[in-house]
Amino acid sequence: MRRYPQPRQTNPNRNMASSTEFRDHVLSLLLPMGPVRARGMFGGFGIFMDDVMFALIAGDTLFLKIDSGNKDDFRNAGSRPFTYEGKKRPVEMSYYSAPEGTMEDAAKLLPWAESALAAAKRAKKN
């Protein structure tokens, strides 16, 4: 099985198209959650379940939705925010990288993905 790079402290999503191979790898890890699908957007992919976007792929990095209910968990796991260059300054989105060591094992990734889906559903209600 191919080993994918873990998120780095630099921002690898800047000016980097996402690979369909990595997208397929992510979808296979998330398959136990149910009907998860990917939609191309801005050179990467949005990851959806029941029309709720709970993750995104930028470059070859998976970012998961965060809110006040799970942000500290992601920070404590060493995850970093998804950022992009805005017109005047970098903009931080409410998505954090999947914690190190989760991208090769669905059992390790799924609790984080389920937390992200719950955060996305809470955000959609508001």
Enumerate the predicted regions with their spans.
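Charge-dense, helix-prone N-terminal extensions
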Residues: 1-126
